[in-house]
Each structure stands twice: as C-alpha cells, then as structure tokens.
C-alpha cells in the first residue's frame, strides 16, 4: 500500500520522491499495479482541487519552457508553490522520448518550491499524456497551488489540455501568419489568452500580430456566439527571455480567474472536467477488461 500521507505532508526531498513514485505508479500499465494506483488516487482526491491549473500550448521553438521558468520563479517570489508537467513527443519508431524540457528550466528545477515532471506522450493525441490529469491531482494534493501543463507543441491538435485546465494559454511568434492562418488553427478558438513571445526581436511584427490575432479571436467569438463569462479572449506581448510582460501576464490570469469565479463559470468548468475525466476512466477500464478477456 502506498503511503499517501507523505505526499500530503511536509514539503521537502522526501515529499518530492513520493510525488515522483506516485506519478510513476499512476502512469504504469502493469495490471498488478492498477488496483494500487486506484487506491492511491481515491486517497488523494479529498486533498485536490485547490490549485489553479494553467495549460500552455504553442509550436516548438515558441519559448514555452523559457516562459514557464520565468513565470514560475516570479510566482515563487510571491509565495506560490509551482508544479510543472511537461509532455514530450514519443517516437513513432522506437516509442522513446527525450524528456528534455526539464533541462531548459535550470533555475526552476532546483528551486525547493517547484516540482517539474516530464512525461512522454506515448502516442496520446491532444498534446498531453494519458495520465496528465492524474499527475496534476498528485501535485495538488502535495500542496502546489499553481499547476502548469506544457503540451507537446505539435500545432493544431493541442486541444485536450483545454479540457483539464482552468485557463488555456496559446503562445505565438511574431510573423507566424496572418489572421486567416490564426483562424485555421482549431486550437485558437479554445484559447483564453494568446501570448506573443519574443516581441523584443521585432516590435512592429509583434504589434501587427497582436492586432491580427485579436481580430481573429473576435471573429471566432462572433461566429461561435459565445462570451466566456464576461471575458473577451485577447492577445498580449511578452519577452520571456528578458522577463518583460510576465507581471502583466499574471495580472491577466488573475483578472480571468476573478471574472470566472464571480460568474460561476470557474466551478462549472471544473465540473465539466470531472465529468470528462470520469468517462475517460470508464473508457479506459472497458478497454482494459476487453484486453484481459479477449
């Protein structure tokens, strides 16, 4: 039996090792560990739900890891504990994954108030791993009040993370395409906020991208006929490498959370996520039973 009290106990190296073991257990595909993983999850669930879940997506090279490290260090200075779940693509040939995102977060990875866990996608679509949601719950039970999920970063299919986080952020580059290109990306209509990174490299292009993306999101909203709980998705500029715009970004996040909470949409979104997770587990259980009994 896994001692879950270590996870919910005092923070430190012992807790970090317990978190790693718990996530490994939940990710295991071994049949003899399935019951133990379910028991662990059941024990941890009462201690979850108190964090803010932030999904971050964007194409490779957009600067997700750099941005997450700068943001994470900024939040830790404000008294937060930050967990980062990074998803690396798995090879379709060997099935392996480099799991190198953690190496791009040198300062954050050694901070005692941060926990970074790289996981392979293992062929799971939507930009996340099969057990990302469960890993997020483990981090919440351990007392991390901000949990960030960095997706694989393959482009238009990065949608699953939007269904398991409180806010979905899409990162873009200046000169990444006009507003029609933005509309083509199905992930755009799910974004609560678009961040244009590396704005310092070409200020004119960044300004143009901000205007084009904002107009594209307004167009998407008009045709979809939705208003996100008194929140109008927008685009902002940052430079993660220089640390410019990080405070403004977090202010937008806080504003979004306040509006969602006031209108009851925050709780509604969590309920929808729980329902989605339940059906995912039912589906996984049926597939497992079919494999066992042919």
Locate predicted features.
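P-loop (Walker A) phosphate-binding loop of NTP-binding proteins
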Residues: 59
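Short, acidic/small-residue loops that bind anionic groups at enzyme active sites
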Residues: 170-182, 222-225
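Conserved beta-strand segments of the P-loop GTPase G domain that flank and frequently precede/overlap
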Residues: 118-119, 170-173, 195-198, 237
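Long, well-ordered amphipathic alpha-helical subdomains in the mid-to-C-terminal portions
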Residues: 18-21, 237-240, 248-294
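Canonical P-loop GTPase G-domain recognition
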Residues: 193-195, 199-259
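Hydrophobic positions on the alpha1 helix immediately C-terminal to the Walker A/P-loop
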Residues: 67
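Nucleotide-state-sensitive switch-loop elements of NTP-binding domains
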Residues: 2-54, 62, 71-157, 164-170, ...
